[in-house]
Amino acid sequence: MLRPHFPALLIGLSVLAVTNAGLSAQDRPARTGRGDGQIVLNADDVAAFPEPPAGFDARREGIERGKLEMVSYESKSVGATRKMNVYTPPGYSRDKKYPVLYLLHGIGGDETEWQRFASPNLLMDNLLADGKAVPMIIVMPNGRAQKNDRPEGNVFASAPAFATFEQDLLKDVIPAIESRYSVKTDRESQAIAGLSMGGGQALNFGLAHLDTFAWVGGFSSAPNTKPPAQLLPDPAAAKEKLKLLWLSCGNKDGLIRISQGVHGYLKEKNVPHVWNVDSHGHDATHWKNNLYYFLQRVFR
């Protein structure tokens, strides 16, 4: 089990102080870069994709819609009943088995954060209607594995609970999903991705468990709690087992050096991966845009 430390500067991350239109940090994300680090861009720190088309995240009429439901499960790791937000695609049927994407939030969020920031259900409904994605189940759990898992007070005090979540995910969340839904359970049918702190978790947990996840994505990841060489100690195994490794960050994000370090190591070791540096900051636009493109490539 990982027992990382979480430096406050590096976790920063999706704690969003927003008062616009009377909304709190729990209601709307900031649209500015985060972190105090100096931004130094390299020649290959460029966008791999254009901005998504207009309306990609809009609720479209005349198409089939998936279902979004809040699900409770018993966590032995935490000793409590916990919640996760689950999307099932249009036409979901017990007669068919589906791949699963585990989508992780930032340090200031919970199981509702992705829905508030990016509406993955709308992205998936639209992509499926256009034939651009594989029907999948998306699981948005709470990465704060403690009995009081609400994002309140000093969220940094909960940092150890983000490490405990590795066990909750592997031993409680995934088994609960497999018992409740009709899902494929092989490694090539399981993906993990996240934003900010959740991006750091996705890289830490996903790359440490290549027997469980073949698709891994980190969007403007908070610090990986291991140096790149420890995060991925066996590049040859990663090349063999990973179907997709995705790294992204905005060129206005003061934390870009974290992702740059991982990208540089992967490039040095010739590990194939997506490296997408767009024109955004540490914000919801970056996360939504990268999820949009990630969804089109996962499980292909």
Residue ranges, per PLM feature:
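Non-catalytic cap/lid and distal C-terminal segments of serine-dependent acyl enzymes
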Residues: 26-300
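Bacterial N-terminal signal peptides
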Residues: 8-19
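Positively charged n-region of N-terminal signal peptides that target proteins for export
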Residues: 1-5
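Sec/Tat signal peptide C-region and signal peptidase I cleavage site
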Residues: 20-25
